[in-house]
Amino acid sequence: HITVNLVRLRPQMNIRQVVTKYGYSIVSKEVANNVWLARRGNKYRMMRLRGEMLDKDGNKSIWNCDNWAFLLDAPFLVSSECCHIMKKRAAHTYERESREKPIVAMMAEEGRQRFQTWTATGCNAFEGKRPMSKPMSFWTEQDVLQFIVDRELPIASVYGDIVASDGENDYNATLIDCKLHCTGCQRTGCMFCAFGAHLEKGENRFERMKHTHPKHYEFCIGGGEWDADGLWKPNEKGLGYGRVLDFIGVRY
């Protein structure tokens, strides 16, 4: 039995209010933020989406994301604001009020921006404007899974079992030296977030939600309506993600 000293934080806006005001979380934080800012006249972000950014050698920049330029014409809002409003803002408020500093489990391999931050600050950034510790920065997903297997640690049922795979078949994680993965969800996070959903192979998060949490699925995929400006937004029946996922080719 494990006792947890937990303080539950609640955001000032709910998910429907956030999506209505700021837009849907699709593709990635980086791409969604580019679309949000480019639509508001940011020339730098527009150049990224058009594939016009060049590096110091005159070659196309790695920050270009022109394959997602079609989202500029999407009939709905797109942004990365949801994470900031529903998670980060609440955490920042708690930090100020409690005067406590965060220890987070972000890993550098999870994204280009996280890797750059780690190379610049290391695992502990105590001198910055927002001091924090990130002790798992140099860990990889395989490190985490192997740690769990070696120590026989319990994990949430939503992840299924940890198994080893040779690319064709799954084996008991302790019987073969191959890459590890979970038979259920590979990652968990906000239920109504579509960041990275286009990369999922096999049954994706929304298809899984359909049979594990049917009421949540209906709220997420169903609902939605056109507003006076011709933009698709949530309504009292649901978030309307179905039309959005259709637009980017993600199954549900």
Which positions does each model-derived feature cover?
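ATP/NTP-dependent adenylation/nucleotidyl-transfer catalytic domains that generate, transfer
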Residues: 128-129, 140-252
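ATP-dependent adenylation/nucleotidyltransferase module used to activate substrates
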Residues: 1-143
